[in-house]
Amino acid sequence: MTADTGGHIRYLMGLVGASEQDPTVERITIATRAFRGFLGDEYWQTRETVTPKIEIVRFPTAQPGYLPKEELWREVPSFADAVIEWIENQPKRPDILHAHYADAGVVAAIVRERLGIPFVFTSHSLGRVKLDAFTRSSGEAMTDAAESLEHRLAAEERALADAALVIASSRDEAEIQYAGYDSYAPGKIRVVPPGSDLTMFTSARSSIAVDRMINRFLDDPDKPPILAIARPVTKKNLIAMVEAFGESPELQNRANLVLIAGSRTDIDDLEPELADNLTRILKTIDRYDLYGKVAYPKGHRPEDLPGLYAYARERRGIFVNPAFNEPFGLTLLEAAAVGIPVIATDSGGPNDIVEVCGNGVLVDATVPRSIADAALDILRSPALWHKYAASGAAAVKAYDWKAHAKRYHGLMRSILSTPSTEPARPAQLLITDIDNTLVGDEAAHAQFCRWLARQNGVGFGIASGRSFHSAMMVLEQEGSPRPEVMITSVGAEIYYLTGDSTTYVGDDEWAKIIDVNWDPDAVNEILGTEPGVHPQAELEQRRFKVSYLTDGDKGLRRRLQEKFAAEGLQCTVTHSHGRYLDILPVRASKGAAVIHVRRRYGLSEDQVFVSGDSANDTEMLRTLPQAIVVQNFTDDMANLPELAHAYFASTGYAAGIIEGVEHFKNRAVTPAV
C-alpha cells in the first residue's frame, strides 16, 4: 500500500469495467498476490467475484505476509508458478495477459515462455524516470533501495523485450522515457491514454465547506487562485510552486496560491518523504513571508475535489501541475472538465493533453520562473483565460473509457489474429500526408476508408511531420486503415508493418544512409543566433530532426540554407505553415524516403502516388510524377513551378486523394491519340 495505490486501483477497475461492456470479452481475471496482515483476512481470500464477467484471483507466494512494493520482486518466481498452475487447471486458458508494472511484466514473460500465451505490458511508471528525477532534484545518485531499483530496471527490460505490445499513456513515455532502455522498440509501443470518468467535474460548483477550508488562510480570498493538487512527494515538485510564487511580487499581487497537498493530522506521523517535503514547503512559505497569500489546508474529502476546482474557476484562477514527470495527468483532465486553464510540466502526458484539449501551456517545471511567467501571461489576458477555459471541454470527449476500450480491444484482436510470415509487397503504393490531407474532414475520411478497402494491390502508407507515435495516435483515433509503411518526422524515420499486422519495425538501413555527415549540435548552434526562432519541446526533437518554431519570416528558409552552406553543413530545411521549422540531414526528406521505400518494394515511379497539402509536402510532391495536391492546400502551392506536373484536385482532404489517384489511373489506361 502506497499513496499511489488508490489511483492504481481506480485505473485498473476503470479498464476492466470498460472491457466487460464488449460482448466479445467473455471473462476477465485480475491476478494478484494473496497475503495475511494488518489489512484483514479479505486479502487472503482465494477468489472474489466482482461482476458476472470479472473475478479477482489471489495467489499465495513464498512469503505469506504483507510486503512493501520494493520487496515484491523476491516473490515473482513463486507467484509465476502459482499462476501457471492455475491456468493449466482452467477449462479454457486466457487468450492474452495484460501485465501492469514491472514485476507483473516478468511474471507474464515467464507464463509466455512456458505456456505460449502472449502478453501486453503497461509500466505506469518507470524505474529510469524515478532515478533521473531523484538525481535531478538532489544532485546525488540514488542509493536507498538500490537493490530494488536494480531489479526493477531488469524487470522492465525483460517486459519490453518479451511483450507482444507495450501500451503507453503518453508520447513522452513512448518516445523519451522508454528510449533509455536497451530493449526499446518504438514500433512495438502504442500510446493509448487512460479513460476518465469526468461527469462529476463538468457541472462542479464550489461549496461552503470548500470556501471555509481555503479562505481562512487568505487576506483577500477574492483574488484568482493558483491551484495545485498533489501528494507532497518529491516527484510532484510542489516546492517549485511556492518558489515561483515567492519570487514574483506581481504574481503575489494578482493571485493567491492554494496547495492541496494530500491529507495529514500530524506531519511527524507521515512517511519520511512526505514529512520532509511538507516541512520544506512550510519553511519556504515562511522564508518569503507568504502568510495571508497561501492556503495549505490539512486535508480534504474525496467529494470535495470537484468543488476545489470549481473554487478556482469561479475566481478565474489557474490549475498548475509542476511535476518533474507526469506519466499521464488525470488532474489536468479534471481541471479541463471544470473549465480552468492549466499550466503543466512539459515532461510526460501533459504534452498530449494540452495538444488535444488546447486548454493551457507547458513549461519546464524545473525552472520556477517559467511557472510564474506562464501564470502572469494568463492572468493579464482575460481573452486568453477564456480561450483556455472554454477549450477544456474537449477532454470529456477525448479521454473516455469507452473510446479507450475500443482502441485497446482492437489492438488485442489484432495481436491474436493469425500472423502472416511477411506482408505481401503491393503492386502500387499510395503515400499521403496525414494532417489536412488524409484527416480533417470526417465524411471525406470515411469515403477514403471505403474506397481503399476496394483497391486490390494498392499498398497504403503515410508521410508526416509527426513522430511515429503521434501519427499512430491520430490514425487510430480517426479509425484510419493501418499503414503498411510509415514515413515519419518529415522523412527522418521509416517504419514497416510486421507480420503480426500490429507492430512496426524501423528501417535501420535508412538510418545509416541519412546519418552520414549529420551534425545536429552544429545546426543548433547556428539556429541559436537566429532571431525569432525558438526550439520546440524536447518531445519534438528526434535523432535526425531538429525542430523550431518561428515568427513567420518568409525569407528564413533561404537564409538558413546560406548559413548552413557557409559552415559546410549539408541539411534539408523545411518551413511550413509559417511557423514550423524542421532541419534534417541532407539525405533525409519525405521525397527521399518515398524513393527509398519504392526501391525497397521494387516499384517503378508510375506505380507510386503521393499526396499532400502544404510546404513540407512540396519536396515529396516534386520528386514523384504522380503527385496529388488536395483542394484545401496552403503555402501558395499552386504557383510553385516545381509542382507544374502535379494534379490539383477539385475536392479537399481525403476526397482529393481519391480524385487524384483515379485521375492518374485513368490517364495510364487512356490510349494516346
Specify the residue positions occupied by each region the protein language model found:
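Mg2+-dependent phosphoryl-transfer enzymes with acidic/Ser/Thr/Gly-rich catalytic loops
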Residues: 584, 591-673
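Structural alpha-helical scaffold elements that stabilize or flank donor/cofactor-binding regions
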Residues: 90, 159, 311-312, 423, ...
